[in-house]
Amino acid sequence: MQEQYRPEEIESKVQQHWDEKRTFEVTEDESKEKYYCLSMLPYPSGRLHMGHVRNYTIGDVIARYQRMLGKNVLQPIGWDAFGLPAEGAAVKNNTAPAPWTYDNIAYMKNQLKMLGFGYDWSRELATCTPEYYRWEQKFFTELYKKGLVYKKTSAVNWCPNDQTVLANEQVIDGCCWRCDTKVERKEIPQWFIKITAYADELLNDLDKLDHWPDTVKTMQRNWIGRSEGVEITFDVNGYDNTLTVYTTRPDTFMGATYLAVAAGHPLAQKAAANNPELAAFIDECRNTKVAEADMATMEKKGVDTGFKAIHPLTGEAIPVWAANFVLMEYGTGAVMAVPGHDQRDYEFATKYGLTIKPVILAADGSEPDLSEQALTEKGVLFNSGEFNGLGFEDAFNAIADKLAAKGVGERKVNYRLRDWGVSRQRYWGAPIPMVTLEDGTVLPTPEDQLPVILPEDVVMDGITSPIKADPEWAKTTVNGQPALRETDTFDTFMESSWYYARYTCPQYNEGMLDPEAANYWLPVDIYIGGIEHAIMHLLYFRFFHKLMRDAGMVNSDEPAKQLLCQGMVLADAFYYVGENGERNWVSPVDAIVERDEKGRIVKAKDAAGHELVYTGMSKMSKSKNNGIDPQVMVERYGADTVRLFMMFASPADMTLEWQESGVEGANRFLKRVWKLVYEHTAKGEVAALNVDALSEDQKALRRDVHKTIAKVTDDIGRRQTFNTAIAAIMELMNKLAKAPQEGEQDRALMQEALLAVVRMLNPFTPHACFTLWEALKGEGDIDNAPWPVADDKAMVEDSTLVVVQVNGKVRGKITVPVNATEEQVRERAGQEHLVAKYLDGVTVRKVIYVPGKLLNLVVG
């Protein structure tokens, strides 16, 4: 081996070896335990960022470790290749989304290879290819036939100038990102998949996911939002239909003083015909996009419709208001308001002077003080007629029963979860495989016409989807009748909901999945990705698995046994204030910094002399220009150094602070390992290790080696605390560097230790370890080498430390053989001069001995 560690030379050679030998390609093998390690597939944006590198390094470390345990390890990679950014980039670069996407894939693939990830490249897939999305289209038509797919009108963002639908991110301050026209809300027909049909199972099966983070499971529970309540029907004077509301607090029903309906509710629409104020309010609501997340913070507004609803139990007439906090697409589009016991209802009632009627006593039994806020806690009823004195449970049941007896209420389980709207009015996505005949009949595209291929050779005008702009593309024939294809495309979450399963059989042509291969590899053993995907992707991912199970393609209930959510990567962020007061963000690479004695940044400027404001560490992002290019770091230090730093700097699930000084430290450590192996191998052949002939010092060093193996095995395998595993290897390396290397058994022990160190480091730094293993004459390639096993006998301590006390005070510590008798320990204690001086001229009256730990001599 060469004396100097030169990653730029060894890494490309090792990568070439892996390519030629197809080292990481796997097939099903029933004789081996399988392990499926999967990182979330990347969007081909053009370049890898450090968040990618962290995610994929964690996955690669786990995959390589499991492989060394002798398992059949699948670690695939692919590209989540459809999506809106490609359309914007195509317009900007005067190209089409397809070539832009494929160029990015080629570039990023080289970047992944440069980092040495052990992927099975034979399974690579790109979700934008017909070979992939054809099966998704076929599956969608099957779900339609099962009644799990339907079409209904739903609100979208509409630009009246461009006559096009806008994604949420294309609406900036209520205006179109392209032409600055005020965006409207428009109802258009869209396709939905009935995820609500699986709501209970998606909720209950969270209990099966023992190895998913509790935070993710809680987020999914809240998103599904199961609640038990009562659906109540109100008659409305002068209105042909009834109003239905759902409440989880029927105990407060006697305090309902008004109803609120969505601006889009038919009752509000009817009332607006003779009410200009209401009509203007409805118009305002129509053109205001309200996400559910904004509801809590926005100003609550409303207009009285003039209609009065009849309280089913008291017979009182209560007003019906149109309000901006009620959404037509949630529930029935109408809510019951109890301002005495709901803070939102209270604020609205206070603002508009509506009646507030308390019906729940305060905790001390007194009438509640509602002068400043509602009483939202549960309690005992009053002011509620026959229900006075009842607690929450009893009141819930009594009022629910009374409403049911009158035929105006029924108990109901509700979900916050809504069906999955999969229509997108974009071009760069998989076409939705549905057609409409001339008579309006909607049918799934026949199987012999699948896939419905998205044309890739298109011209983007940045306004209308090319398949919507081309009337010829939509024309087709079904059953001999003229038909028009659907020109909407799938939500890109569709592709990422089942890719993990297609990896098990990417070349299979008989169907969506090869059940044999899928059931060998699935479920995924560990899935690695960011927590930002907790409720969208990870919920659809679970839902799709259940759909595929019910179609007979997979036999498990859940797609992944374990979920590991890696933390974000942070970096220093700097800016200077420009002439117009704007912030100009400067890359940390270009910041010249001064630090205090504790290493804190106290002053910074850039090459142009601008005084920089340091804002601290924040998530690497384009907006703050604080991303660090992985490629630059690999070219400077080598892939192994970058990987090692990524795994050492922080626990995998915590944020990682990018510090180049830490990268330099990782590089120095690898150079030390390299140097020690070089010096050891330069001395020539090594004799066999004779454990029975080892000195006490040699035994102690060997004990450290095997204790480190045990710790690293536990840290990587069970605890997944990769940073502490690396720290343990570093600690051992410090001891090895000081160990004598002259005697025959010294060198034999060093050989055993270095073979163990190189294998333990291999998942983290595979290029260097591949080369070091060869230099140490390890058997075969390190990629096929077994993980080192700790020798229990080597870890047994020959001696132990005993604390010696005289009259309860510590006077010394002695080392004795582990099997020493009490007499031998007393004798050894007497020879310790620190102890002996307290025994001089006194009588030992009592001896308290805790074997192997404590000797207390009571003297007088």
UniProtKB/Swiss-Prot annotation:
A motif ('HIGH' region) lies at residues 42-52. It is an enzyme of class 6 (ligase). The keyword Electron transport does not apply. It is found in: Cytoplasm. ATP binds at K622. It comes from the Bacteria. InterPro entries: aa-tRNA-synth_I_CS, aa-tRNA-synth_Ia, Leu-tRNA-ligase, Leu_tRNA-synth_edit, M/V/L/I-tRNA-synth_anticd-bd, Methionyl/Leucyl_tRNA_Synth, Rossmann-like_a/b/a_fold, tRNAsynth_Ia_anticodon-bd. Its EC number is 6.1.1.4. GO terms for molecular function: aminoacyl-tRNA deacylase activity; ATP binding; leucine-tRNA ligase activity. Keywords: Aminoacyl-tRNA synthetase, ATP-binding, Cytoplasm, Ligase, Nucleotide-binding, Protein biosynthesis. GO terms for cellular component: cytosol. CDD domains: Anticodon_Ia_Leu_BEm (cd07958), LeuRS_core (cd00812). One of its GO terms (biological process) is leucyl-tRNA aminoacylation. It catalyses: tRNA(Leu) + L-leucine + ATP = L-leucyl-tRNA(Leu) + AMP + diphosphate. A motif ('KMSKS' region) lies at residues 619-623. Belongs to the class-I aminoacyl-tRNA synthetase family. This is Leucine--tRNA ligase. The lineage of its organism: Bacteria, Pseudomonadati, Pseudomonadota, Gammaproteobacteria, Enterobacterales. The gene is leuS.
